[in-house]
Amino acid sequence: MDELHFCPKCGEETLNWDGEKKLSCNQCSFVLYHNCAAAVAVVIRCGNEIMLTKRSQEPGKGKLDLAGGFTDPKESAEEACARELKEELDIEIIPENLKILLTLPNIYRYKDIDYNTLDIFFEYHVDKKFDAKLDISEVSEIAWIYENEIDLNEIAFNSQKKFFQKYLNRNQ
C-alpha cells in the first residue's frame, strides 16, 4: 500500500498509509479503509482421506491448498463454498451440510499488495471419492491424502498450516 500516493478524491500526492489498515489524505481528509476480506476453505473428507488441490497460480503455485476462495459481495460463507467448489472442481454440494470448524487471520499477497483475510474453514463429508473437472487456471490437480500423511511443508498458506496443526490433532 506504500506505492499508492495520489488521492482518488482530490488528486494530490498526499495519500498516506498508516501501515496497517487505512489510507488517508492530508489535503482533503479522504479516508479509505483496507479491511479484511473473507475467504473460505473446505476440507472435503471421505473417511480418513482429505481432498487437497495443487495451486496453478501464485501465491503458492505448486503447493497444496484446500478448495475455496474469496467471498463475493452479498454472499454468505456457505454460498461462497458452493460457488468456489463449482468453479474450481465442477462439483455441487449441499451448503447446509457444511460444518464450520475454525476461523484464522491470514495475509494473502497478490501483485505486491498484502491483503488481510479472515479465512473460514469448513468440513464437508462425501461418501465416495470423486474425480473433478478442474479449472486449470486455478487448480492443476487434486489429491486424496490420508490425514496422517499430510505434509504441512507442502501447504500453500500459513493459515492453512495453522488450521491443519489444530485439525489433525483434534482427537489427541
Language model features with spans:
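Acidic, metal-coordinating catalytic segment for phosphate/diphosphate chemistry
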Residues: 1-41
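A short coil-to-beta-strand element that immediately follows conserved catalytic motifs
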Residues: 17, 92-102
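A generic structural micro-feature
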Residues: 34-36, 112-118, 134-139
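Conserved hydrophobic "DFG−1" position in protein kinase catalytic cores
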Residues: 44-45, 52, 124, 144
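Conserved Nudix-box catalytic region and its N-terminal flanking loop in Nudix hydrolases
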Residues: 45-87
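A short Gly-Trp-Pro
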Residues: 67-72, 121-123, 155, 159-168
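Active-site-adjacent beta-strand/loop module that shapes the phosphate/pyrophosphate-binding cleft
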Residues: 102-131
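NUDIX/MutT-family hydrolases
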Residues: 133-164
